[in-house]
Curated annotation (Swiss-Prot):
<keyword id="KW-0217">Developmental protein</keyword>
<feature type="binding site">
    <location>
        <position position="305"/>
    </location>
    <ligand>
        <name>2-oxoglutarate</name>
    </ligand>
</feature>
<dbReference type="InterPro" id="IPR044861">
    <property type="entry name" value="IPNS-like_FE2OG_OXY"/>
</dbReference>
<comment type="function">
    <text>Involved in the regulation of shoot development and salicylic acid (SA) homeostasis.</text>
</comment>
<dbReference type="Pfam" id="PF14226">
    <property type="entry name" value="DIOX_N"/>
</dbReference>
<dbReference type="InterPro" id="IPR005123">
    <property type="entry name" value="Oxoglu/Fe-dep_dioxygenase_dom"/>
</dbReference>
<dbReference type="InterPro" id="IPR026992">
    <property type="entry name" value="DIOX_N"/>
</dbReference>
<keyword id="KW-0223">Dioxygenase</keyword>
<feature type="domain" description="Fe2OG dioxygenase">
    <location>
        <begin position="213"/>
        <end position="314"/>
    </location>
</feature>
<dbReference type="InterPro" id="IPR050295">
    <property type="entry name" value="Plant_2OG-oxidoreductases"/>
</dbReference>
<dbReference type="GO" id="GO:0046872">
    <property type="term" value="F:metal ion binding"/>
</dbReference>
<protein>
    <recommendedName>
        <fullName>Probable 2-oxoglutarate-dependent dioxygenase SLC2</fullName>
        <ecNumber>1.14.11.-</ecNumber>
    </recommendedName>
</protein>
<dbReference type="InterPro" id="IPR027443">
    <property type="entry name" value="IPNS-like_sf"/>
</dbReference>
<keyword id="KW-0963">Cytoplasm</keyword>
<keyword id="KW-0539">Nucleus</keyword>
<dbReference type="GO" id="GO:0005737">
    <property type="term" value="C:cytoplasm"/>
</dbReference>
<keyword id="KW-0560">Oxidoreductase</keyword>
Length: 378
């Protein structure tokens, strides 16, 4: 399709109510498209390059050994969070099959009217079926549909469960079991991370707040794309919150930023493992010792990909900043981040800033070097 034709196509439906793209990528695929609609075509500089690097071999952490207080595994966890911001976790106890099966059925088998019941552009909605990444502000849309399930207080899962989709029949129980398993896993990993960081004074309070924190499950669907080299399933971003636990199927797609040259390495799915990554809040809490790393999703021309991300945060009203034990001006460890909360994040999402830099970047404090010049804190 010529560029002019794509541009004309992008304007169809503007100002006339619901456009076809607003119904999601799955609906576009069902309509039989053979070329990528203009709304999804990235500028040449932003398009994913052909694979030129081998799959990323993320650090592997064994939770069974971590539970046994193996100092080598605690050191491995610390190094992974510090150097990579990502790791693969084995022996985690999270039952993956039922959740992925239910997710596939939800996205691929249900007719549009059943899915459309939960469709919304409201980023604050607790249950939301949506498309793209931040569809109100995205200049170019992402090749992704998703189901968002938000639990504002993880102690009250039973209260929110009735609002979750009741079709297919096995989605709600599978999602509830998966959410509970991820909550337990998050608690264990946070205990280990606080130990590795040497956070003692506020450890108990933080863990209690983790138990009463929020959990957002994002069930992602990336259908097979007619021109995958022109678009992305998700643009480069970091995750809000403390930790994200990602369950993915066997189809490659997750890519992690590495080095200073803007390179991307695809993550090879490890059978039986979940992927865990550091979120913005944990980088802030650690005062920059741990890294919340940019990542993105590329799409496949032949196969659909499904993933389930469980993002864990403290309560929405909780203000978080660097742990006092990790800030010491006299020893060269200045405070590197402003305090933040969910309100600041939602305001950021609603602004135009989200199109060109990460939320974490907006919370960093510039420091004064010995030469008197202002420098970024990391």
């Amino acid at each position: 399709m010529a560029i002019l034709e794509r541009a004309e196509e992008a304007n169809i439906g503007e100002g006339s109510g619901s456009s076809e793209w607003e119904l999601g990528v799955r609906q576009l695929c069902d309509s039989g498209i053979t070329t990528l609609p203009a709304r999804y075509v990235l500028p040449p500089a932003d398009r994913p390059a052909r694979y030129v690097t081998p799959p990323a071999l993320l650090p592997v952490v064994d939770l069974a050994a971590l539970r046994a207080r193996d100092p080598c595994q605690l050191a491995a966890l610390h190094a992974a969070c510090r150097d990579y911001g990502f790791f693969q976790l084995l022996n985690h106890g999270v039952p993956p099959d039922a959740m992925l099966y239910a997710a596939r059925r939800f996205f691929f088998d249900l007719p549009l009217p059943a899915r459309k019941r939960y469709m919304s552009a409201d980023i604050r909605a607790a249950v939301r079926y949506g498309t793209s990444f931040n569809q109100l502000n995205d200049a170019v849309l992402s090749w992704r549909d998703f189901l968002k399930l938000l639990i504002r207080d993880t102690r009250r899962l039973a209260d929110v469960l009735p609002s979750w989709p009741d079709a297919p029949d096995d989605l709600r129980p599978a999602a509830a079991a998966y959410a509970t398993a991820c909550q337990r896993l998050f608690r264990e990993l946070m205990e280990a991370a606080l130990d590795a960081l040497g956070i003692v004074r506020c450890r108990r309070q933080l863990l209690e707040e983790c138990d009463a924190g929020s959990q957002m499950m994002m069930v992602n669907c990336f259908p097979a794309c007619p021109e995958p080299e022109l678009t992305l399933g998700m643009p480069p971003h970091s995750d809000y919150g403390l930790l994200t636990i990602l369950l993915q199927d066997e189809v490659r797609g997750l890519e992690v930023s590495y080095g200073d040259g803007g390179g991307w390495a695809v993550v090879e799915p490890l059978p039986g493992a979940v992927v865990v990554n550091v979120g913005d809040h944990l980088e802030i809490l650690s005062n920059g010792l741990y890294r919340s790393v940019l990542h993105r999703v590329r799409v496949n021309g032949r196969r659909a990909r499904v993933s389930v991300a469980s993002l864990h945060s403290l309560a929405a009203e909780r203000v978080i900043g660097p742990a006092a034990e990790l800030v010491d001006e006299q020893r060269g460890r200045p405070r590197r981040y402003m305090d933040t909360d969910m309100a600041a994040f939602l305001a950021y999402l609603a602004s135009a800033e989200g199109n060109h830099k990460s939320f974490l970047h907006s919370r960093r404090i510039n420091t004064i070097s010995s030469s008197g010049l202002t420098q970024p804190s990391n």
